[in-house]
Amino acid sequence: MSFMLEVDPQKTGEAVDRYLKHDFERYLRLSGKHRTDISSPSMNGMPSGSPGNAQEAKIIEGTYAGQVVNAIVATIQNCSDFDYRKPYKQILVDYYIRGLQNFKIAQKIGYSDRQFDFKKRMAQCEFADRFEYWKIVYHVQDQPCLQIMQRAKNCAKFAD
């Protein structure tokens, strides 16, 4: 008997939410960046200041944090935003970067609260999927996998 797994949207959304609210904020601080710095896709992730022997560990930590920030920004920039049915990039930017409240984003993109909650969850799931690729590109594979899996509801159909 085989078990088919699929992403659990609720738990994945919660994992992405925790990561982008807490870990992302910490990496921004460690890299010397601010949310206002990441509106430009040309961000290079390099820490500011001059390196010194006494501060080598801090420089390395800041450089790594910059790479994590770049991976997060690239992931958000790569999320779907090509039509009104998938405004995922806009939702992620407005909520996690600009700090807008859910109801304001819902009004901005023309969705009811219920529709918005679903779209936000789908945006979080897309972020979790795409983050796996961008972690490799930016050499931060030790960052957590945000995809939380569950047994597929209809897996009996596919069992051996």
Where are these regions (language model features)?
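Short amphipathic alpha helix immediately N-terminal
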Residues: 82-100
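Short acidic, glycine/proline-enriched loop segments that cap or flank alpha-helices
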Residues: 79-83, 111
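Short, locally clustered residues in the helix-turn-helix/winged-helix DNA-binding domain
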Residues: 77, 93-97, 128
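C-terminal low-complexity, acidic/polar tails when present
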Residues: 42-50, 111-114, 122-123
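Amphipathic alpha-helical interface surfaces
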Residues: 68-72, 87-88, 119
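N-terminal interaction/assembly modules
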Residues: 1-80, 133-160
